[in-house]
Structures are given as C-alpha cells and as structure tokens.
C-alpha cells in the first residue's frame, strides 16, 4: 500500500518538478544503501519520549491503522497527554530560494485527534519560538504533504524541528516521512521577500510590512512571529497582484521591552511560509540628566544655559527645545533652541517659572521627557501705572476718608510692593507753611482715613505705587475738608480808633477760618464811665457784619466810657471763639445851655455884665470855667463858636499886652462855684484865681467868650461860646467907620494895580515872542533843550480842556527872556534820571529823544522847514499850554491857523494822465515830481503821481504817492526799483466805506508785474499794522532787492485815530527798520494826501523835538503843502498832529530790549533820596496824566435808561466806540452788554474785557461768548466777592448742562490745582443748532485774594498766562473774555501782561507803558494802581528769568 502511494507521489513529483530536479537534502527513512540525499536528523534530548522509526511491509503483523513503509511514528496511546517529542532536521544554510517538503500522517480509529504535529524553524541556534505550522485532528489513513517556504539565507542558518504533542485523548498515530529540501520555490506555501529591520522610538507605533510571492490558499493566515514565540496576527493582507500580496503588522506604542527579532509567518494546511528575522529596534528618546543653569534674570526675561552634556537615552540629538511654564501653572510653552544659551522673553515679572530642556532624536516620538526643571523667578518690573480711582468716601472737618481701585498684579508687576498715600496742605495764615505727609498702606488696602486735618483746607492727595524696580505717582487730586466752627480772632488783630462818641473797630479774619466766613458778630456794652450820667454796665448790643466787612464804626456812644467788645466769626457750622477788648471813648468837650447869644445883663463904659450858665460835662466833669475877653478888630472875620476856636493857652492881661495879642483871660472860676446860672461883670477890676479882670476901654469893641474845660487822664476838652459883644462908646464910632472904609478902598486899589501889572507882563511876553520869531531859524535862539521829564499834567487827547485858572497858568509860565536869564526849564526836575541815561551804546532811530535819550547831532543846513515870523516854533516844554490855548482861544485857534494854509495858494496843476489820476485827480508840483526812467517801448511813460518830500535835515527822504490803481501797479513797482526804496508805508485799507481805496498791488505768493517779479517772503501781523517782506527781481538785472511794506490798518474810515499810541509805535518801527543808506520811504494812503501828510509831519516833528527841543508844526505843514497839494486835508487832522506830538513828548520812548531789561528795571525802581520817588512811579504818574477820562457823551449807550441795570456800577462804563454788540437775537432788541473790545500786541480785538456777570446779564454773557467766537474765559475774581450790592454768583453749570436764554451751556470736563480751576464747556445756540457748538475753556484763577491789587504769586499768574496761551493755540486763536469784579484793574493787568509777553516773544522787547496805555485808550480803569503797574514789570522779569533757566 505504502509502495503504491509512494509510486503515486513519485509520479506526481516527476510531473510537477523539473525532470532533473533532485532533493538537495532530506530523509526518506528507507533502508536503501545509496539514498538520494543524505539524511541527517536527530531527536531532542529533553523530549518526553522518542519518535519511533518504523518499517512496515505487507504481511507484517502490525496494527491495521498504520500504512506500509519506512517512516517516523508516534503511538499516542503509549504516551501521556501533553507529552511531546521532537525531530530536529539537519542545519540548512541556503543561498537561494528553496522549499522544504514533508509528509505527515494523523489518524485515530475513533476519529479523535491523536495529537498535534507542529513544525518549528530555529534560526542560528536561537530560541525555538512558536510553531510556524501545526496540524491536529484525524485526517484518515493516508499521507498528506506540506511545504515550508523558509526565507532565511546564508550566512544565516536554520533548523526545522517537528514536534509531536499528545492530545488528551491519546489515541491514534502521528507519522512523519519524506523530509526533503528542493532548490525551487514551494508550490503550496508563499515565499516572503526580505524583511528589513524596523527602528522606532519608544512609545511610537511600529509596523512590519511582509511582502509574499506565491499562491495563497483560502485558509492562509499570516502572523508576525517574535523570536520569543509570540504571534501577532496581520492587521490586513492586501493583494498586489494575483501572486503577490502584502501583509501589514502594526505594533502599537512599542517600548524597550518590545525590542526583539521578528519574522513573518504564513500558515495553511498545505504548508507555511517563514521570512527572515528582522529586528525591531526601539530607541529611547534622550533626556538631560541635569537641569539648565540660570545665567541672568530680568523683569520679563530669563537667560539660561541648556546644560545638555550628559543625557539619558539614545542619540543622536537633532533638536533641542526649552519647555517652560509658571510654577504650578496649567500651561507650558516650548521654544526651539540652536545655541547653548537662550533668552526667554515676555515673561511676567516677579513670577516663578519651571524651565526644562527637551532633546529630540530622529524619528517620530524622538523627543524625550523633559529634563530636570530649573525653578527660577523673574525680577520685579516697574509698575505700569499709579493707582487710579482716587475719590473720597467720607469728608469731615478734620478727617478725610479716601478710597481707590484695588490693585492687581497687572498694575503692581511685583508681589512685593507698597502703596503710599501722600498728601499736603497749607496751614495758611502768616506762616503759609505746607504740611507734607506720606503714609504707607497695608497690603491690599484700598481705603484710608487721613486724620488731624484742618477744616476747609484743600488737601492735595496722590497715591504712589512702589516696588523694588520703580515707582509710579498718581495725579494729584484735590479734596476739601468740611467746614468747622472758626478759630478765634486774634486779640492783637483788633485795632481801633476811639473818638468822642464813636469808635472805629477793625479786625482781621481768624487765622484759622476753618471754612468760609459767613458773618462776624460784634457784641459790646459799656462797663465803666467817668460820666456819672452813664449807667454801667449798660445793655449788651449785637450787630452782624458780612464776611468781607472786617470793620465797623460804632456811633452814638457815650464819651469817656469804657466798652467791652467781643468779636467772633461764623461759618456754616457755627460761631467760633470771641476775641475781647476794652475800648474807652475820648472825653468830649462840655456843652452849654445857650440857645442864642444872650443879651447883656448890664453895660457901662468900662464893664459889661453877662449871665454865666453851668456847662454839662460829656465824659468827664467840668474842671474849670474861664471868661475870655477879645478885642474886636475892623478886618477880623467873625468868629463862629466851635472847639477849634477856643482858647487853649491861658493868658493873663499882662502877658497878652506884652505879646501884642488881642485876647486875654479875665477870670477863671472853679467848677464848684458855678452850680447854677449867675451874673458876672467883665471889667470889674477883680482877680479870679490869678487872672486880673481889668476895666474895658470905652473906645474899643470887645467880644466876650465863656469857656468850660474838662480834664481827665491827661486829656483836655474845651468848649467856648460867645456870650456878649460890647461896642465902643458912641463918641468914638465915626472915626472907626472912616478908618474901616479907608482900608477897604486901599484893598480895592491894590487889586486893580496888581491886575494891571500882570497884564503888562503878558503883553511884554507876546512882543518878545513875535520879535524872536522874525529870525529865519527862530528856534535856534531858544534855550538849549534839556532832557524832558514826564511831568504829571492832566491831558485829554481829543478833548483837552482849558486849565481851571488860566491866569495862574500865565503867572506860572516863564517867558523866553526869563528862561534865558535864569537858565531854567520845567523839565529840570530835581533828581530826575531819564531812562535813556541808563542804557549803554549809541542812540539809534528807535531810541528817540522821548524819555530823555541823548539827542542825536543835528545839522542846520539843508532843512526845508523854516520858522515863520508870525508862527514861531514852540518849545516842547510849552507845547501843552500852546495846545490848550489854541483849542480854547476865541479869536485865533486851530481853526483859523488851519484855514490860513489855503490863503494865496497858487495851485499850478499839471494835467493828469489817465492812468495816474483818480476821480479827484491830485496834481504834483513839477519841481518835486518823481519822474520814472523812460521805457524803450514807451518813452513817454515817465509819469507817476508821486512827489519827493524832505525829511528832517534829509533831502527827498519821503515819496508821497497815491494808492496804486490796477493800471498803475507796474509804474509803482518801477518807482520802488528805480529809487531803491527799502520801505513802503501804507495808511489805508483796500476798501473803506464800500469804496475801493487802493488796489492790491502785491502778490499772495509770487507774481510778475511787467518785467518785475515780486515774491512775498514773510508776513508779520500785529494788532494795528502788518509788515510784509518782498523780494524784487527784474528781468535783465542780477540784483535782488528786499522791500518791506508797513501797512497801518488802524486808521478809522472816518476822521482820525482816537489815540495816537499805535501810530507813534508804528512810526518808530518804520524808522528802526529802514536802513540809513536806503532810498526814500514810499508813503501812500488813498490819494496820497491827508493821512500821508499826517505821517510825514509826525516823523519830521519827532526828529525836530528830539534834536532841538522844539516843534514847528505850522511851518512844516506849510512846507509840505508846497510840495504836494492838500497834504493836510482837515482841521481834525491838524489838531491830531498836535495831540500826537504832545503824547509822544509826554510819554517818551518806553521800550526796553530784553537784554537790557534787568539792569534798566533795577534802576527804575531805585528810590531817589532827594525826590523820595522812583522812575517807575514817575512813569505811572505820566500814564495817569495822559489817560483820557471818559466824557458822558462817549458812554451814551451805557447810560441809556434801559441799560442801567446791566451795569454793576455807573462809575465803570465802556465807551461806545469799543462796545461788542450782541448778535444772537432772543427777541429783545437790546444788544448792549457792559464789555469792551481791546487789542493784544499781535491781534486786533483779541480781548473782550467785561465785568462779572450779574444774575440778569448771565444770558447776555454767554451770548457774547458765542457771538464773538470766544474760546477762553479768564475769571480773576472770586465768587461771592462783592464791593457793591451785587454779589458775584456762579454763572456756569457744574456738572451737567443749563440753558441761559438762547445759549445752552454744557459742562464737559474740569481740572483743578491750588492756583487754577480749568473747565471746558460746550456752548451752542439752541435756536440755531445747525451752527454747531463752540468749545470754551474757563480759567478760574484762585491766587488773587479779595481786596488785593495784585495776585498772590507771580509764578501762578505766569502759569495762568501760559495755560491760556496754550489753549488759544490749540483752539484756533479765538478771542479771550477777561473779567473781574468790575472789568477794570485786574482784567487790565492780565491783558497788559499778556501783551508784554507777546512783545517779548515776537520782538524781544518790553514796553509795559505801551501795553497799559493802549488798554487805557479803550477803558481808563485798566491797570488801575501803581501796584498793578509794578506787577506787570515783575511778571516780565520773572518770565525772562524763567527763559534764562531753560
């Protein structure tokens, strides 16, 4: 049977295998002496039993179940279950593909499994592992063939092991035969491609990809077999083609324990495929052994060194990273690192961090665990800001509870920090000491109570946050403690003046007012009196006074009586402690009980008997009575009884006779002797207490006086009354009358003679003046001019009145002859030191005579201005008197003098060319006519309406011309180029009264006029004039000329300027800016006559006054008119010239360069020991003298009945000419408000000065602000301050919004400090919302105490000026409203200081006088007092010193 089967197998093999293929090795277990292949096998020594090699032939007596043949067999019934035995095939080491075949037999008669036949493949003598193939069960009594496709090649070797494992049934047989090795692929088992090693990092997933070739059976299973024997089933098998398939074996999260050798195994009943062993290499990611090292720490960074020299794990290291987190923090952040040091940025200050190093090797999951951490803390950082939200929680009189926002780490930036609450306040009073304290708060505190404060004090508090790295100070917030009862009034502050029946009592505010004093209470009562008629103690009386009334006059008191006064102050919290003082009234003169002079009781030639009545003592008893006899003289004025007429020195008759006196004491009576009325005979020849009463002379008249005296404590009071008159005897009466009449006639004749003498002197003076005027240069005979003082004279620019006593003026005036003889002038004031003498350097055109500057040398030749015979020059010293005479003279004055210019004129006129003329053409005189150079294109184009005018001792110094018309502009610039003019003076606006007065002959930027290019280089705008600088270039010329145009814009459209202050400053500016070697100054207005003539006359006369001390206005005007017709057009212009020259002479040059200011000012305030005055005081007196008082007609609008209630006081009214009329209409036709528009230095109408709004005028005030675009309001008085019956009330909302008539005012924001409260308001017209709103800042200045002329602090005032200036610049330069109580002194001081500071910034000049004078031209009460004027200088000095420190 076996043989038959073997034959079948052989045939099959021969059919399937190559014909020449023979096994390379194997065992057939046959007995043939020459086997096909060598057979090498062995049995394992550790088996439980041994395989049996059997040979069963036919006929052999064997169990029926066994097949015939030679093979290896195991009888399961002979072994115990679980026992096993192994057959070890020979060691194989093949170079190429090969196949191992074997036959097996598994049979049990009852069908049970005899056991399991397993096949193992051991590689290189390694562990056995698990079976690569096994078969169990009963498969019949036939042989089955299986194949092993082992893909292990040389140099590796392997062994195949067959294992028989006895089943629990242990019945049946297991057979094994024909183990053969063939050098061709297996047909029944797949061959695996080479399996490569797999390297992964620990914890990562590994995957073996097993590629197999062959025909896979349906029951084929694939496994990944570990060398240790563990099998892993395939996750999936993917067929690449019909003979190739891929099995994938994933290994999840492998670790070092999974590192081993693995191979692929396919199992099927027909055989198994086994791959080579591949290694699963598991690398441990690296980890540093030591933590990183800290190199440096900062608030927001840490610099570390990685310290990775020693590691745990496998390399190589391909990446280094830093992992850091807050200590015990939930987050971590990783940064890659390239160097050994690394800086961690953007860390939180004062925070502990854990920092570890991560190392990474190649491959996924190659990053190792973080190394040991470095635990380090960053430094603290400077706090981000100061604590916020500082506010009060509770305010009491002496303590303040504050609270603020709690602080978080994001603010402190450090866990170690401190909050300090610092506060300061001023004690006030005379000490003016500032208390400063800082209190350190407890950790986490957001509330604190400051104790032991003073009531009603501004407490300036700020919070300071500090940590080790810095500090942040919060903004200072001001709180005010509540009021308390006031402290006591200091007893030493009580001052008093006792009179007889009145006491003037004055006191000072308590040193500790502890709030706003609302009233004072004064109680008084009599406690002692030397007058027995006074009941003591008397009733107690009480009066109350307002807070600003710290004095009182107590009347109807008793003389000689001591009163006890108590004075105490009150706040809203009640009364404070009273101050006590005792004041005794003076005793009063006794009083008499005589209704009229009584009739004598009797009279003789030598005596007269009178009735003496006792007097009544007032405050003291009568001490003595006296009878006084006075001889009546003819011319003596009649004595009226009174205390001043009494006789204080007792004179006996003998003493009076010896001294030649007319009165004597006839008797002295003790008070006790006259207790009731009694008769007394004057002249009874008796002696009374040492006084002889001699008989009276019959021929003389006598007046009899009765005198009573009271003496008390060194005081004496007298009262006397005339009680009788004794006439002379009748026979002596006629001679007396004749004598009286003779004396009266003599007096009349004396008065007449004196008047005649004065008249003769006056006529003599006039004759001398006329004779002196006949000389051609009459003014050269005048006394040598002297430095002119600013004499205090009353002067009104436009309305100068005659002095009250003309005769006295004439008497005081010295004639020219007398001045020459005496060598005197009213200017030679003792101790006068003119300002100019203090300056260093030479005299320039800007430093004129005025103010005593040294006169420049004057030549005589070449001057065209000659004094006439009937119109001689007037000395500067006599100019005021001359103007007064000319304005008030009835026969000959300015009117007649002006009209004389037109008498006998031969106005030869040249026919005007069309392009040069105007509607009323003005012809120029040929001799002085300016001729233009002819042009090639038009040789006749040489005419221009312009004339040369001489200056003072300077020929052709001016060119007077008309304002250019469009067709005349090119000729105008031709003339400027031809004459090399450096200055153009323009005294007109382009359009006036709706008519074009002058064409705009200059460009906005640059333009060509013919062949001349004009470029505007610079524009400087001031309040009353504009200076434009032009560059002139002409085609064909290489030269470039610079020309300045001085455009005076303040000349009114009608008449003349109200004041000359601005025009005089303008003339000085032109003089100073024109180079001495330049060509003529071109001057034009509209027609080139009236205004132009005024300018030239003023320029010339200022030079003449400076050089010679005289002015000759009349002849100067006459000479000008000979050069150009109608140079002075109106009498008003002629008078204005005189007034302007007078103002210049009186005021002088008051400008000081800033580099000379300190030294000059020091000299100005020096007190002259002779005059006990200073230059500064004299300058202020000059300012007062030239300040024009307002007439009633000038304030006609303010005086209208409907406007009276809009004025706080009728003494301070704005003139009509500078009123800002209200524009917004609220239905009321009245558009008046008590306010005045005034100039600053650089801007016209820059200020609006007004008074503190009344309750009824508050809507008008806000209309004024809105209508005139006022962006700043400066408040210089305090609320509730009142010098009148009108209180100063708050006129703004705070907070919120409020409607004031048409205007809605909304509070936007506010800030405050100890000097200034600043508020921002939004103002809009509620009836015209489409116009938008106006943003206004309100500056309430706190450092100007009531009843003080000047602010408390110059520094604070400068701060106010700076803040206003800064806001004005930010808000677009709107107007500024300035107000105080009455719109006078304080407001004027502010405007003057602002003007002076502008002057310093623009031109480095200081001129306080000019600033004050300009303001007073609008309102005479501006800069009212000497202290305020002095303060303006101090502010300028403080400002300049502050600039030096920058």
From Swiss-Prot:
Q: Which residues lie on this side of the membrane: Cytoplasmic?
A: 771-1446
| Membrane-topology annotation of the record | Single-pass type I membrane protein
Q: What is its main location?
A: other
EC number(s) stated in the UniProt entry for this protein: 3.1.3.48
Please report the stretch or stretches of sequence annotated as the MAM domain: 25-188
Which tissues show it? Answer: Transcripts of different sizes are differentially expressed in a subset of tissues. Detected in brain, lung, skeletal muscle, heart, kidney and placenta. In brain; expressed in olfactory bulb, cerebral cortex, hippocampus and cerebellum.
- List residues, modification Phosphoserine: 848, 853, 863
This chain is glycosylated at 75, 410, 685
Disulphide bridges: 210-264
Q: Which residues form the Tyrosine-protein phosphatase domain?
A: 888-1144, 1176-1439
Q: Binding positions for substrate?
A: 1053, 1085-1091, 1129
Q: Which SUPFAM superfamilies match?
A: (Phosphotyrosine protein) phosphatases II, Concanavalin A-like lectins/glucanases, Fibronectin type III, Immunoglobulin
What does its PTM field state? Answer: The extracellular domain is proteolytically processed through cleavage within the fibronectin type-III 4 domain. In addition to the 190 kDa full-length protein, proteolytic products of 100 kDa, 80 kDa and 73 kDa are observed. N-glycosylated.
Q: Where is this region: Disordered?
A: 830-867
What's a single GO BP term from this record?
A: positive regulation of cell-cell adhesion mediated by cadherin
Region annotation Mediates interaction with CTNNB1: where it falls in the sequence: 771-887
Pinpoint the Fibronectin type-III domain residues: 288-383, 386-484, 485-591, 592-668
Q: Which residues form the Ig-like C2-type domain?
A: 190-275
Subunit info? Forms homooligomeric complexes which mediate cell homotypic adhesion. Interacts (via the cytoplasmic juxtamembrane domain) with CTNNB1; may mediate interaction with the cadherin/catenin adhesion complex. Interacts with KIT. May interact with AP3B1.
Q: What is the documented function of this protein? A: Tyrosine-protein phosphatase which dephosphorylates CTNNB1. Regulates CTNNB1 function both in cell adhesion and signaling. May function in cell proliferation and migration and play a role in the maintenance of epithelial integrity. May play a role in megakaryocytopoiesis.
Entry similarity comment: Belongs to the protein-tyrosine phosphatase family. Receptor class 2B subfamily.
**Which PANTHER family does this UniProt record tie to the protein?**
RECEPTOR-TYPE TYROSINE-PROTEIN PHOSPHATASE U-RELATED, SUSHI DOMAIN-CONTAINING PROTEIN 1
Q: List the protein's name.
A: Receptor-type tyrosine-protein phosphatase U
Q: Which species does this protein come from?
A: Mus musculus
């Amino acid at each position: 049977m076996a043989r038959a089967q073997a034959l079948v197998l052989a045939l099959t093999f021969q059919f399937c295998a190559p014909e020449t293929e023979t096994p390379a090795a194997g065992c057939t277990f046959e007995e043939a002496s020459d086997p096909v292949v060598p057979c090498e096998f062995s049995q394992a020594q550790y088996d439980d039993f041994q395989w049996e090699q059997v040979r069963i032939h036919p006929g052999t007596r064997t169990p029926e179940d066994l097949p015939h043949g030679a093979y290896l067999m195991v009888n399961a019934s002979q072994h115990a279950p679980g026992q096993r035995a192994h057959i070890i095939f020979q060691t194989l080491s093949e170079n190429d593909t090969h196949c191992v075949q074997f036959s097996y037999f598994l049979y049990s008669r009852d069908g049970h499994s005899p056991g399991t036949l397993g096949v193992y493949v051991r590689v290189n003598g390694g562990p056995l592992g698990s079976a690569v193939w096994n078969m169990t069960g009963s498969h019949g009594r036939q042989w089955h063939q299986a194949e092993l496709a082992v893909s292990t090649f040389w140099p590796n070797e392997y062994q195949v092991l067959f294992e028989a494992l006895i089943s629990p049934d242990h019945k049946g047989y297991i057979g094994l035969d024909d183990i053969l090795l063939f050098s061709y692929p297996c047909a029944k088992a797949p061959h695996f491609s080479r399996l490569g090693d797999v390297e992964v990092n620990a914890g990562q997933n590994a995957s073996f990809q097993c590629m197999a070739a062959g025909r896979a059976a349906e029951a084929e299973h694939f496994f990944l077999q570990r060398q240790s024997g563990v099998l892993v089933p395939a996750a999936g098998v993917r067929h690449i083609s019909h003979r190739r398939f891929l099995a994938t074996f994933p290994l999840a999260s492998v670790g070092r324990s999974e590192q081993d050798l693995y191979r692929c195994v396919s199992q099927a009943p027909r055989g198994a495929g086994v791959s080579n062993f591949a290694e699963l290499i598991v690398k441990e990611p690296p980890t540093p052994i030591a933590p990183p090292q800290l190199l440096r720490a900062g608030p927001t960074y840490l610099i570390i060194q990685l310290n990775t020299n020693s590691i745990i794990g496998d390399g190589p290291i391909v990446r280094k990273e830093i992992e850091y987190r807050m200590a015990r923090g939930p987050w971590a952040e990783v940064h890659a690192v390239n160097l050994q040091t690394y800086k961690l940025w953007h860390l939180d200050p004062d925070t502990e961090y854990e920092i570890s190093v991560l190392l990474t090797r190649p491959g996924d999951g190659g990053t190792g665990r973080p190394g040991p951490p470095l635990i380090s803390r960053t430094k603290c950082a400077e706090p981000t800001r100061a604590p916020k939200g500082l506010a009060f929680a509770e305010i009491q009189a002496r303590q303040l509870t504050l609270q603020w926002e709690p602080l978080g780490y994001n603010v402190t930036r450090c866990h170690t920090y401190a909050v300090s609450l610092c506060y300061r306040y001023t004690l006030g009073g005379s000490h003016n000491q500032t208390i400063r304290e800082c209190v350190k708060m407890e950790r986490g505190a957001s509330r604190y109570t400051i104790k032991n404060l003073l009531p009603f004090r501004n407490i300036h508090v700020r919070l300071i946050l500090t940590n080790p790295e810095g500090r942040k100070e919060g903004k200072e917030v001001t709180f005010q403690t509540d009021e308390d009862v006031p402290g006591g009034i200091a007893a030493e502050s009580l001052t008093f003046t006792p009179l007889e029946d009145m006491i003037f009592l004055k006191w000072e505010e308590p040193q500790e007012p502890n709030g706003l004093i609302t009233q004072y209470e004064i109680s008084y009562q009599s406690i002692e009196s030397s007058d027995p008629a006074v009941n003591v103690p008397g009733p107690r009386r009480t009066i109350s006074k307002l807070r600003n009334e710290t004095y009182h006059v107590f009347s109807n008191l008793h003389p000689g009586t001591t009163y006890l006064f108590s004075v105490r102050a009150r706040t809203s919290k009640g009364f404070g402690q009273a101050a006590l003082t005792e004041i005794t009234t003076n005793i009063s003169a006794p009083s008499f009980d005589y209704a009229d002079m009584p009739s004598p009781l009797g009279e003789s030639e030598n005596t007269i008997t009178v009735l003496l009545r006792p007097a009544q003592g007032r405050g003291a008893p009568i001490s003595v009575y006296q009878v006084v006899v006075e001889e009546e003289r003819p011319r003596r004025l009649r004595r009226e009884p009174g205390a001043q007429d009494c006789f204080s020195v007792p004179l006996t008759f003998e003493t009076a006779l010896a001294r030649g006196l007319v009165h004597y004491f006839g008797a002295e009576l003790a008070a006790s002797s006259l207790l009731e009325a009694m008769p007394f005979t004057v002249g009874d020849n008796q002696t009374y207490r040492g006084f002889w009463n001699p008989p009276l002379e019959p021929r003389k008249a006598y007046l009899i006086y009765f005198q009573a005296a009271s003496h008390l404590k060194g005081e004496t009071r007298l009262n006397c009354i005339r009680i009788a008159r004794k006439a002379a005897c009748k026979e002596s009466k006629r001679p007396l009358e004749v004598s009286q009449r003779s004396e009266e006639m003599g007096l009349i004749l004396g008065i007449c003679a004196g008047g005649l003498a004065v008249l003769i002197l006056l006529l003599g003076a006039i004759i001398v003046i006329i004779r002196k005027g006949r000389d051609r240069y009459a003014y050269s005979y005048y006394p040598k001019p002297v430095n002119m003082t600013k004499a205090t004279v009353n002067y009104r620019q436009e309305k100068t009145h005659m002095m009250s006593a003309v005769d006295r003026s004439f008497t005081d005036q010295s004639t020219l002859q007398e001045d020459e003889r005496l060598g005197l002038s009213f200017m030679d004031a003792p101790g006068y030191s003119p300002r100019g003498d203090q300056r260093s350097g030479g005299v320039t055109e800007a430093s004129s005579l005025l103010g005593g500057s040294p006169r420049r040398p004057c030549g005589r030749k070449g001057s065209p201005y000659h004094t006439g015979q009937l119109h001689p020059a007037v000395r500067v010293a006599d100019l005021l008197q001359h103007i007064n005479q000319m304005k008030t003279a009835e026969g000959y004055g300015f009117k007649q003098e002006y009209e004389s210019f037109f008498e006998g004129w031969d106005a030869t006129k040249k026919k005007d060319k069309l392009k040069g003329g105007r509607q009323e053409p003005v012809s120029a005189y040929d001799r002085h006519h300016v001729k233009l150079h002819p042009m090639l294109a038009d040789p006749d184009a040489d005419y221009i309406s312009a004339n040369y005018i001489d200056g003072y001792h300077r020929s052709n110094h001016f060119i007077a011309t008309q304002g250019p018309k469009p067709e005349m502009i090119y000729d105008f610039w031709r003339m400027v180029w031809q004459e090399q003019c450096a200055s153009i003076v323009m005294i007109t606006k382009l359009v006036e009264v709706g008519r074009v007065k002058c064409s705009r002959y200059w460009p906005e930027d640059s333009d060509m006029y013919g062949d001349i290019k004009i470029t505007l280089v610079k524009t400087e705008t001031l309040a009353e004039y504009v200076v434009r600088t032009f560059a002139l270039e002409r085609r064909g010329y290489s030269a470039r000329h610079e020309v300045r145009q001085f455009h005076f814009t303040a000349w009114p459209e009608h008449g003349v300027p109200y004041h000359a202050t601005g025009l005089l400053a303008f003339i000085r500016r032109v003089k100073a800016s024109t180079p001495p070697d330049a060509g003529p100054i071109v001057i034009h207005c509209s027609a080139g006559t009236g205004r132009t003539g005024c300018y030239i006359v003023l320029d010339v006369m200022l030079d003449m006054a400076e050089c010679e001390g005289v002015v000759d206005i009349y002849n100067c005007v006459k000479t000008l008119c000979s050069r150009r017709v109608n140079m002075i057009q109106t009498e008003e212009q002629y008078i204005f010239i005189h007034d302007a020259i007078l103002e210049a002479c009186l005021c002088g040059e008051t400008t000081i360069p800033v580099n000379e200011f300190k030294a000059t000012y020091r000299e100005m305030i020096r007190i002259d020991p002779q005059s006990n005055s200073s230059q500064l005081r004299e300058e202020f007196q000059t300012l007062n003298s030239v300040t024009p008082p307002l007439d009633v007609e000038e304030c006609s609008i303010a005086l209208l009945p409907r406007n009276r209630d809009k004025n706080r006081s009728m003494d301070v009214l704005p003139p009509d000419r500078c009123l800002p009329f209200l524009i917004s209409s609220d239905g009321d036709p009245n558009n008046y408000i008590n306010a005045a528009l005034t100039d600053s230095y650089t801007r016209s109408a820059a200020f609006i000065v007004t008074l503190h709004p009344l309750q009824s005028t508050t809507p008008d005030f806000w209309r004024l602000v809105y209508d005139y675009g006022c962006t700043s309001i400066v408040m210089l008085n305090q609320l509730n301050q009142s010098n009148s019956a009108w209180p100063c009330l708050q006129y703004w909302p705070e907070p919120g919004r409020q409607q004031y008539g048409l205007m809605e005012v909304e509070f936007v924001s506010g800030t405050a400090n100890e000097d200034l409260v600043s508020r921002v308001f939004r103002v809009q017209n509620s009836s015209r919302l489409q116009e938008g709103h106006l943003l206004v800042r309100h500056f309430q200045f706190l450092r100007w105490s009531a009843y003080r002329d000047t602010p408390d602090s110059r520094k604070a005032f400068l701060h106010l000026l700076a803040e206003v200036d800064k806001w004005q610049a930010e808000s677009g330069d709107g107007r500024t409203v300035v107000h105080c109580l009455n719109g006078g002194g304080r407001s004027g001081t502010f405007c003057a200081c602002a003007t002076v500071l502008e002057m310093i910034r623009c031109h480095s000049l200081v001129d306080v006088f000019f600033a004050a004078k300009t303001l007073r031209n609008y309102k005479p009460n501006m800069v009212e007092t000497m202290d305020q004027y002095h303060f303006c200088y101090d502010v300028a000095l403080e400002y300049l010193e502050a600039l030096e420190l920058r």
